Design a protein with these regions (language model features):
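Alpha-helical bundle regulatory/interaction domains
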Residues: 1-34, 80-226, 230-236, 249-250, ...
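N-terminal low-complexity or simple alpha-helical regulatory segments
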Residues: 1-67, 72-73
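Short hydrophobic/aromatic patch on the recognition helix
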Residues: 239-243, 247, 291-292, 296
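Aromatic (often tryptophan-rich) hydrophobic motifs at membrane interfaces
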Residues: 228, 238-239, 254-263
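Well-ordered mid-protein domain cores that form the structural environment of catalytic cofactors
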Residues: 49-50, 56-102
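DNA major-groove recognition helix of helix-turn-helix
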Residues: 243, 251, 255, 296, ...
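Short aromatic-centered micro-motifs
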Residues: 42, 81, 292
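Short, conserved glycine- and acidic-residue-centered signature motifs
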Residues: 64, 206, 256
Length: 320
């Protein structure tokens, strides 16, 4: 059933939770200061549209759900996310096929748009409209005709604007169906030409190594770089090179920031009331209390003791 939700977030954990259905497996804030983000999500019968407005740099690890195509499109004149080390222009789209795993990062305030729909549905509509097979590469960058991209952006924006204004139009099944058909038609027009760039075998292999790095950190948050290198079967030099391209930083710093996030999450969970901040920090690999406190305050804008009593702020309005 069509519906929508617009949310404002004061903490990254709630923001991440809202993005899980879109395939966001992890979210790591890398910018300093208070977290602020706004997210509007629109669910139609056969697709989901969303737009996000973020104020701090972050790295997200995305796993596109099975039988799903994910489309990243530009919003306004703000820079969009960097996908797998690839920067996109305001005139470009990125598409990601079912099951693809990739890192996406921002380097400051960012606004982005996304479309998520069944890859089989898109292929069926594409065949019907073009009269030929409609198959997309696993990951590709597109530069549609200006008129086609303008039309897609218009329909995407119309759905988002309707949701944010809390209008009842999306609750009308005929209106929602008509909007969905317009978005699909405009999207197929944008993807009918050849992509300007598609992932090479080498790039796919490098991306897979970074996905395995995430798997390793999930099971062992603080592996040594020697251990990571041996497990992934690459040199430490190559690991650093891949991480800088995809993550915007070296593997050691990424690992430490993830550790800081785990500490913050533990402090906010309410399960650490009988533990000191230093005990929690040591449990997650931080041996120097003074350095930990300085780095924590620089990253989150508050001392760990304040985190113990701080509640994430979130407001949301829903319409169906």
């Amino acid at each position: 059933m069509p519906g929508s939700v617009t949310s404002v977030f004061g903490g990254p954990d709630d923001f991440h939770a809202a993005l899980r259905e879109d395939g966001v497996l992890s979210l790591l804030v890398t910018g300093n200061g208070p977290f602020r983000a706004r997210l509007t999500q629109v669910a139609l019968d056969h697709m989901h549209l969303s737009t996000g407005d973020e104020h701090l740099s972050r790295i997200a690890f995305v796993g596109v759900p099975a039988d799903t195509l994910l489309v990243s499109l530009p919003i306004g004149d703000r820079p969009g996310p960097i996908w797998g080390g690839v920067e996109t222009q305001a005139s470009e789209l990125m598409t990601f096929g079912p099951g693809q795993r990739i890192h996406t990062r921002t380097t400051g305030p960012c606004r982005w748009g996304a479309i998520r729909l069944s890859s089989e549905d898109l292929a069926e509509y594409g065949r019907a409209l073009s009269g030929a097979e409609f198959a997309l590469p696993p990951i590709a960058r597109w530069r549609p005709r200006r008129a086609a991209l303008r039309q897609l952006s218009h329909f995407h924006h119309a759905a988002i604007r309707t949701a944010e204004a809390r209008l009842a139009a999306l609750a009308n099944s005929q209106t929602a169906h008509g909007l969905e058909q317009q978005v699909i038609h405009a999207l197929i027009q944008c993807l009918s030409a050849r992509p300007v760039d598609q992932e090479t075998e080498a790039a796919s292999r490098y991306r897979g190594l970074l996905a395995r790095f995430e798997d390793l950190l999930l099971g062992e948050p603080f592996p040594s770089m020697d251990q990571v290198s041996v497990t992934l079967g690459i040199s430490k030099r190559m690991l650093r090179e891949y991480c800088r391209k995809h993550l915007g930083m070296g593997p050691d710093r990424y690992r430490r920031l993830r550790g800081m996030q785990l500490v913050r999450r533990a402090l906010r969970s309410g399960a650490e009331e009988t533990s000191s901040v230093c005990e929690v920090a040591r449990r997650y690999g931080y041996r120097d209390p003074r350095r930990f406190l300085v780095n924590y305050r620089a990253l989150y804008g508050e001392l760990p003791s304040a985190t113990l009593q701080r509640t994430p702020r979130r407001t949301a309005t829903r319409s169906k």
